[in-house]
Every structure is written in C-alpha cells, then in structure tokens.
Amino acid sequence: MQVDFYHLTRQPLTRVLPRLAERVVADGHRLLIVSDSADQRAALDRLLWDYAAESFLPHAEAGAMDDAAQPVLIAAAPDPLNGARYVLIADGVWRDEALGFERAFHLFDESAIAAARTAWKALADRAGVERRYWKQGEKGWEQAG
C-alpha cells in the first residue's frame, strides 16, 4: 500500500485535487475523496463540476445518488461505497482506515503540517506501507521523501 503525502505550498487544494482525481480516473481507478467537513464536501462537489471548461469528471457526494456507480465519490468517512481502491484525504486529517486502500493521497497545507509529520512518522514502521512525500517546487511536484 502506498501513501503519498502532498504538501500544498504553492497551489491550493482546489487546484491540486481535480488534477489528481482526473489522473486516477484516467488510469482506470475509482477514487474516494474524504473530508469531515460538510461545507468542504459541498465545495468539492461544486469544484469538480466546473473547475475547467474542457473537463468532465463524473462524481457525487455519498448518499446523493447511486454511490456504487460513481467513479469519484465524496464522503465524510473512508468507506469505499463506490468500490474505490484509492482514497484522497482532502481535509488534512490522517485516518488509519486509509491503510485499507491500495493507495492514499494525503493532502495538507501549512495549518496541518504538524499532524502530517506525526502521521508520516507513525507510518514509518508499518509493514507493507510505502511512504512518499511530495512538495511543490518551481517546476511542479518534486518527490522529497
């Protein structure tokens, strides 16, 4: 299982999340986006409808329509009702339930850096967990750990 820590320093979540979601779906995977905040989930739902004029990313909020049919599902908890094997943590709060997925994307900004460091360290000795740390550089994302 792979955990990718994305430290948002140059671009906000609203710019990074849609591109990651597009890439996951283009690669033939399903994605579960997790946030504890109902306001953030609603904002992400709106964002994925209109973040780029040329893009269309089918998705829904959990419970809004047929969850199992959604390539991208936005939910409060890491329960893959859409059969997702990839999870994206959008609220910056690490959840160990993400370890039940094939791959986890943990996005966080400066306000959540201490918690992200704690999660990074806690996962260091977990068997079967490969950690990657990504930071935003001048030329885009750079793997730093």
Language-model regions, residue ranges each:
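Residue-level detector of anion-binding/catalytic polar loops
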Residues: 30, 129-130
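Conserved functional acidic sites
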Residues: 126
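Conserved active-site loop/cleft motifs that coordinate metal ions or position small ligands
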Residues: 132-134
